[in-house]
């Protein structure tokens, strides 16, 4: 979102000076503005956030479709040729070296799992607002399956187009807009990308930890306080993003995060479908007494935590093989 604001400022001739933690003054102003706007939006409550998301989603689709058409018009037949190279596992398509298109598939699959692993754990924070189960199923069908397939098609076309037009793979949508060099598209795209990324931050990075912190210490932390704590932590991480985190690389960072959180989702699924046989005592879920059914041992399910540590260690090791013992390290390294 801050990159979108920086793009807008740059379009009007505002250039940054100086540098701190890898960001110039324009980027810092944009980052602080976006952080403040997110806190304001969060403070207004779930209803305003829902209305904001209903605007942000269609807006980014409009921009991406226009961007795809613009790049396709410039690329001509070269776009489809580059898309074919991506599917054939060409040199510029990414993925795991030496595995061709299957390697590219594995790379995309791991990124998708890493991304959704963080979101799906807190699915209940939003699913509880639906009117009935049928609405939830429709939302999952169109939001996860339909949306991901259609948006992936758009991004695939744009990716192939950037290679054909600019001779290089352009990863950031804001960079693509800047290269197209259309003032109207730049203005609309900046606002749309700003809205979309703020909306994603609300759903994936803001509301879930706010609920989690409030549930962790309900007598001392309410929902809003949890949101402020989250905002402070997010500001620190965001401030270090360019100078520290990006040095790790986007894919390793997302995959590491997914490797830590994905086992939690797996444990939840096994616990519900296999161990508890799809039966939950809802009233007992809110019973914090030591004799409660779900209090376990001191409030912690030690078996679940051991399962998470073991599976998480192996999952993180698939991203960083050097932390694993010989045999496993060689397997994931190769």
Residue ranges of model-derived segments:
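C-terminal membrane-solvent junction of multi-pass transporters and transport-like membrane proteins
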Residues: 264-334
């Amino acid at each position: 979102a801050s990159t979108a604001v920086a793009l807008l400022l740059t379009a009007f001739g505002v250039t940054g000076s100086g540098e701190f933690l890898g960001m110039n003054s324009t980027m810092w102003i944009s980052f602080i503005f976006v952080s403040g706007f997110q806190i304001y939006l969060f403070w207004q409550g779930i209803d305003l956030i829902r209305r904001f998301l209903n605007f942000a989603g269609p807006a980014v689709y409009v921009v991406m479709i226009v961007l795809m058409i613009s790049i396709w018009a410039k690329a001509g037949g070269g776009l489809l040729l580059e898309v074919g190279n991506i599917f054939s596992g060409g040199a510029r398509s990414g993925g795991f070296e030496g595995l061709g298109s299957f390697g590219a598939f594995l790379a995309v699959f791991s990124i998708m799992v890493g991304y959704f692993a963080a979101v799906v754990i807190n699915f209940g924070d939003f699913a509880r607002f639906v009117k009935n189960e049928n609405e939830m199923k429709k939302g999952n069908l169109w939001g996860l399956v339909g949306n991901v397939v259609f948006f992936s098609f758009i991004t695939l076309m744009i990716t192939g187009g950037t290679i054909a037009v600019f001779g290089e793979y352009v990863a950031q949508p804001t960079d693509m807009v800047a290269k197209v060099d259309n003032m109207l598209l730049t203005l609309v795209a900046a606002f749309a990308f700003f809205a979309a990324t703020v909306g994603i931050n609300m759903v994936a990075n803001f509301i879930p930890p706010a609920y989690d912190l409030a549930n962790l210490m309900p007598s001392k932390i309410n929902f809003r306080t949890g949101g402020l704590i989250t905002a402070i932590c997010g500001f620190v991480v965001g401030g270090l993003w360019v100078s520290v985190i990006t040095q790790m690389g986007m894919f390793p960072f997302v995959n590491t995060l997914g490797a830590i959180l994905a086992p939690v989702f797996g444990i939840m699924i096994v616990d519900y479908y296999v161990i508890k046989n799809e039966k939950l005592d809802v009233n007992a879920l809110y019973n914090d007494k030591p004799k409660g059914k779900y209090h376990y041992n001191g409030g912690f399910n030690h078996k679940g935590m051991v399962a998470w540590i073991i599976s998480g260690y192996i999952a993180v090791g698939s991203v960083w093989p050097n932390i694993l013992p010989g045999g496993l390290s060689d397997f994931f390294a190769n």
